[in-house]
């Protein structure tokens, strides 16, 4: 049998075995595991001398698996494993063997013993092996090992002692490690085991560790892992054992630990052990006494002196050791800050006593701990600097909170704050080691951002100190930057940026109306001006960090750069600065930079700067008539659109370049129209001829390129190039529009008509024609359809109702497409809703949609049918997924498949489109002779839902709102919307009221109460739906009222047909009708949800 297992295990682990062979071998091994004598078989596999390490490992792993199963976890089986494995282990560890077992096998043996411990130790396991620790200590001759201090001690005995320690560590990890999430039952069991250990074995273990620490140094050097494992045990167990077992009155135990602080092999374990000891949870005053008693700062004085005298003592070779030491000292300091917080929050303590304790702890920190941590923070290694950050966060938060507690509080800390800020300045600088973008980003994330946050806290604590220090730092660097490295100049710009952020966020605590005239703001303005005066030096710099940071600084602080006199004719300084900034942008420093990331970022920032400084730019354009031409000529090389290669997805490999290139088109469009929109300066009107010929300089190359694409034919590269050109034209139009019309008026058609000149309309009429021609050639390609919709949407505000003839043709071409995707229809419906909103009072627009509605609805249904077919195919090919979704649909928006998701999104867009008719008072379109045939289809879409669609509450909300509004607008068969200028008062559709009643009433009652809809009234989204159903019923009641006969068809249908049909009790029917007829809208909705649906749902 053992040979057979060996063959099977080898087959599974042989990389040359095929999948079928491995699967068969695994099945056969599983069969052996399930046999009655499985434990005996795999014990034999482990202890057999002929078994190799792989077989032993597999055997041990299988034993763990078998012991944890209910069938094998019986006393006889566990005792068998215990007896055989311990007997074999004694020979393996203590026998005079030439070689010891490899670590991975020793770890697996520890896991087997830990499993036995968890299943047999303490009364929660029936007291099967309460002598666990005694037996293993005897097995490994622990007493002999720790009592023999002779250097000739048997090495195997020391290895056995080390193994015992590691076993204890694994046990502690199993019962006390807080990083694992355990069940409540498991946690209770672990607590029971820990209680049993405290009562019976912890003192023994503590004595073992104590004796290990007393071993002769020569023995320690013979087996350094023994001391490390001992220290690890103390550090691991200390969180839940009695601290007095480790800390005695004479600190003898602790002094034994301290002696390993300076031993090379044990330093890290020693640091971690002490860290765990000082982190032991205690009451604040007990913790303070404890921290003072252990006298750790005296033990660490050596390291403070060493690093202060020779910072180069830290090298890459010993970096891990110093990181561990820094973490220890940081944690030591944090413990004191925790004491401060706990004392302050203790309501039982006297205020004066609190102040005394806090002052005492603060003095300890300032005198003994902070000087050491400042040295570590000032070290050149980022990892060591970062290790100190948790303490600084706590301590600065303490200073910020208590700065107002006494007049002398801040002065007492002034030296610290001054030193700390100086170190922040130094450590914020990039080092020569940071050479790649990844290096810079890592430094920013791990070091610089934290230091920036610390600076911001210092501003709040002592504004004058911060401003004085940062001003001196920036001034000195600006003065000497030409002689310094690029890192110094980059840091200078970064600190100016930080100063501006502190001002904007008002960390200085100024009155809002005083911020712009305050000393910090004046200081910032001075630095910004000095930077701009260094133009020649700036342009000569070839460093991407400086280039990007400078542009960000200028754009985000434009309001500080330009004074409040920017609107006056005498503000020549501001004009010069503005032109200077434009020239910097339009140079190799920025927009023509050789580095792609700088170029792309500058293109965005350039346009952002233009839009933010609209007032300044308009004034400068008015004073410099040729400036627009100069700007256009300078940046025209950047306007050329080129598709160099295309990937498998049909997109440009350089899509990022094009996406950012669009910002330039928007920016140049903004400048052109801003130049011609100075009403207050030129008194221009829409009828005044304005020269927009400069647009030809931009558009003509694009049109020529489009013509070339049409001539070449529909290759993937050509199609993508056409897409890019159309997107560029649309983005240019957007820039032209926002340059002409104030941002808060962009959607006001009256303002648009007033400000948009006829010459511009003529230009864009030609553009619309060109787009249509291009679209007619390539309308079967979805990215061309997408770009055409995008561009036409940007032309609408400019052309206003003059775009309708072009829109008509565009819609025809889109609806004629045979492969229209669902997402395209969704976007298209949004585009049409925008048209309805903007031109709902226009007769031509009304006629356009009157003709369009029927083919549009048919197209939507065609796409939905295609989606349903795809969904059926997906469901049939993957039935388990569909079943699982149906079973878990309760109370959630379920996405069954991609096709189902597409259908839901399309139906929601469809309902939103229908909503635009009621929102803009054009519902008469639905009642017209042309659309009367499609109206039943539309209404059926609104009253038909599947159970899964009911779970899509966001879609249902839109659908029910549309249904309510339809009933409100034409629920009795005539158009009831008085704001609808196209309604025909003589037109009436007979039977429409009866249709709404017969279709909607069942919806109102079935959705909440039919179990197939899984309606959970307690969930917010379903409760909202219930309010919509109540509103629907109320609208039905209102529209069904007949003032002539005083009858209401809705009430009649409820009382005589539907409610008796569903067997609603008579008293509830009477109550419902009474509330429906007497309550107002909001009152009825609340009653229907809280007193009708909710009450009846409780009885289900």
From Swiss-Prot:
UniProt keyword Nucleus, yes or no: yes
Origin superkingdom: Eukaryota
Q: Record keywords: Nucleus included?
A: yes
**Which keywords label this protein?**
Cytoplasm, Nucleus, RNA-binding, Transport, tRNA processing, tRNA-binding
* GO cellular component annotations of the record: cytoplasm; nuclear matrix; nuclear pore
Q: Where in the cell is it found?
A: Nucleus; Cytoplasm
Gene3D superfamilies the record matches: Leucine-rich Repeat Variant
Similarity section: Belongs to the exportin family.
Outline the subunit composition.
Interacts with GSP1, GSP2, NSP1, NUP2 and UTP8.
Q: What does this protein do?
A: tRNA nucleus export receptor which facilitates tRNA translocation across the nuclear pore complex. Preferentially interacts with tRNAs with mature 5'- and 3'-termini and does not distinguish between intron-containing and spliced tRNAs. In the nucleus binds to tRNA and to the Ran-GTPases GSP1 or GSP2 in their active GTP-bound form. Docking of this trimeric complex to the nuclear pore complex (NPC) is mediated through binding to nucleoporins.
Q: Which protein is depicted? A: Exportin-T
Q: What is the lineage of its organism?
A: Eukaryota, Fungi, Dikarya, Ascomycota, Saccharomycotina
């Amino acid at each position: 049998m053992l040979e057979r297992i060996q063959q099977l295990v080898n087959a599974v682990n042989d990389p040359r075995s095929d999948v079928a062979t491995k699967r068969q071998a695994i099945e056969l091994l599983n069969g052996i595991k399930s046999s009655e004598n499985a434990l005996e078989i795999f014990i034999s596999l482990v202890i057999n001398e002929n078994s190799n390490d792989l077989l032993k490992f597999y055997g041990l792993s299988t034993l763990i698996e078998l012991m944890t199963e209910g069938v094998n976890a019986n006393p006889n089986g566990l005792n068998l494993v215990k007896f055989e494995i311990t007997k074999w282990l004694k020979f393996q560890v203590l026998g005079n063997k030439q070689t010891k077992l490899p670590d991975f096998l020793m770890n697996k043996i520890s896991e087997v013993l830990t499993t036995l411990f968890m299943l047999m130790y303490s009364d929660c396991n029936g007291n099967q092996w309460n002598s666990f620790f005694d037996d293993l200590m005897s097995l490994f001759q622990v007493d002999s090992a720790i009592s023999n201090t002779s250097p000739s001690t048997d090495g195997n005995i020391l290895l056995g002692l080390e193994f015992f320690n590691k076993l204890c560590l694994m046990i502690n990890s199993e019962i006390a490690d807080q990083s694992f999430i355990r069940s409540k039952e498991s946690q209770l069991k672990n607590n029971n085991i820990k209680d049993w250990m405290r009562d019976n074995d912890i003192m023994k273990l503590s004595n073992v560790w104590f004796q290990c620490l007393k071993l002769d140094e020569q023995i320690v050097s013979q087996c350094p892992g023994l001391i490390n494992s001992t220290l690890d045990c103390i550090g691991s167990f200390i969180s839940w054992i009695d601290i007095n077992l480790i800390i005695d009155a004479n600190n003898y135990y602790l002094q034994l630990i301290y002696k390993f602080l300076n031993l090379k092999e044990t330093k890290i374990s020693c640091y971690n052990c002490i860290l765990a000891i000082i982190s032991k949870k205690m009451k604040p005053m007990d913790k303070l006494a404890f921290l003072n008693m252990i006298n750790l700062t005296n033990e660490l004085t050596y390291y403070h002196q060493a690093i202060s005298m020779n910072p180069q003592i830290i090298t890459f070779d010993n970096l891990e050791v110093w990181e561990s030491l820094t973490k220890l000292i940081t944690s030591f300091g944090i413990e004191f800050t925790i004491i401060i917080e706990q004392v302050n929050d203790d309501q039982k303590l006297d205020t004066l006593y609190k102040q005394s304790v806090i002052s005492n702890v603060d003095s300890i920190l300032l005198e003994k701990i902070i000087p050491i941590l400042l040295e570590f923070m000032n070290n050149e290694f980022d990892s060591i600097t970062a290790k100190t950050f948790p303490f600084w966060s706590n301590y600065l938060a303490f200073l910020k909170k208590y700065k107002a507690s006494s007049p002398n509080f801040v002065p007492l800390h002034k030296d610290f704050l001054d030193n700390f800020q100086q170190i922040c300045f130094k450590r914020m600088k990039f080092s020569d080691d940071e050479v790649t973008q990844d290096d810079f980003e890592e430094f920013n994330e791990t070091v610089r951002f934290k230091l920036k946050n610390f600076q911001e806290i210092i501003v709040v604590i002592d504004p004058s100190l911060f401003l004085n220090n940062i001003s001196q730092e920036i001034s000195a660097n600006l003065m000497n930057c030409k002689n310094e490295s690029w890192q110094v100049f980059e840091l200078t710009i970064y600190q100016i940026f930080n100063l501006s952020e502190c001002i904007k966020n008002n960390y200085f605590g100024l009155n809002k109306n005083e911020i712009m005239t305050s000393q910090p703001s004046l200081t910032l303005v001075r630095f910004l001006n000095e930077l701009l005066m260094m133009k020649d030096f700036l342009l000569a710099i070839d460093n991407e960090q400086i280039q990007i940071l400078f542009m960000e600084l200028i754009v985000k602080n434009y309001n500080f750069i330009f004074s409040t006199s920017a609107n006056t004719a005498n503000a020549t300084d501001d004009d010069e600065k503005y032109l200077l900034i434009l020239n910097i942008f339009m140079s190799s420093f920025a927009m023509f930079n050789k580095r792609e990331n700088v170029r792309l970022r500058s293109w965005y920032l350039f346009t952002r700067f233009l839009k933010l400084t609209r007032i300044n730019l308009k004034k400068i354009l008015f004073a410099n008539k040729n400036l627009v031409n100069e700007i256009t000529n300078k940046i025209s090389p950047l306007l050329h659109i080129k598709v160099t290669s295309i990937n498998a997805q049909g997109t440009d490999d350089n899509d990022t370049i094009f996406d950012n290139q669009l910002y330039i088109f928007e920016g140049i469009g903004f400048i052109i129209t801003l130049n011609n929109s100075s009403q207050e300066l030129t008194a221009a009107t829409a009828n005044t001829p304005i020269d927009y010929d400069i647009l030809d300089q931009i558009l003509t190359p694009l049109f020529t390129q489009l013509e070339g694409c049409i001539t070449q034919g529909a290759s993937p590269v050509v199609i993508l190039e056409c897409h890019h050109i159309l997107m560029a034209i649309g983005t240019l139009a957007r820039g032209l529009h926002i340059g002409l019309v104030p941002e808060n008026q962009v959607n006001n058609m009256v303002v648009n008509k007033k400000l948009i000149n006829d010459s511009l309309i003529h230009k864009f009429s030609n553009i619309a024609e060109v787009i249509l021609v291009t679209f007619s050639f390539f309308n079967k390609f979805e990215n061309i359809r997408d770009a055409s919709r995008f561009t036409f949407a940007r032309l609408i505000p400019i052309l206003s109702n003059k775009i309708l003839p072009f829109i008509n043709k565009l819609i025809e071409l889109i609806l004629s497409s045979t492969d229209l995707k669902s997402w395209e229809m969704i976007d298209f419906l949004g585009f049409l809703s925008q048209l309805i909103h903007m031109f709902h009072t226009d007769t031509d627009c009304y006629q356009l949609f009157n003709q369009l509605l029927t083919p549009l609805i048919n197209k939507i249904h065609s796409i939905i049918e295609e989606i349903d077919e795809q969904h059926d195919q997906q469901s049939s090919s993957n039935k388990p997924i569909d079943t699982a979704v149906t079973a878990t649909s309760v109370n959630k928006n379920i996405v069954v498949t991609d096709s189902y998701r597409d259908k839901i999104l399309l139906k929601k867009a469809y309902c939103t489109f229908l909503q635009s008719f009621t929102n803009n008072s054009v519902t008469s379109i639905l009642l017209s002779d042309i659309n009367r045939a499609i109206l039943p289809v539309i209404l059926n879409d609104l009253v038909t839902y599947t159970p899964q669609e009911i779970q899509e509450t966001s879609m249902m909300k839109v659908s029910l709102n549309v249904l309510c509004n339809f009933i409100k607008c034409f629920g009795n068969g005539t158009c009831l919307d008085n704001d609808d200028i196209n309604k025909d008062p003589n037109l009436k559709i007979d039977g429409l009221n009866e249709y709404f009643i017969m279709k909607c009433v069942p919806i109102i009652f079935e959705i909440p109460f039919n179990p197939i809809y899984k309606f959970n009234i307690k969930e917010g989204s379903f409760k909202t739906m219930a309010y919509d159903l109540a509103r629907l019923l109320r609208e039905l009641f209102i529209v069904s009222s007949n003032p002539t006969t005083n009858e209401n068809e809705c009430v009649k249908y409820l009382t005589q047909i539907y409610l008796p049909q569903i067997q609603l009790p008579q008293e509830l029917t009477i109550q419902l009708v009474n509330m429906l007829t007497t309550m107002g809208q909001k009152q009825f909705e609340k009653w229907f949800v809280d007193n009708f649906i909710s009450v009846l749902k409780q009885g289900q």
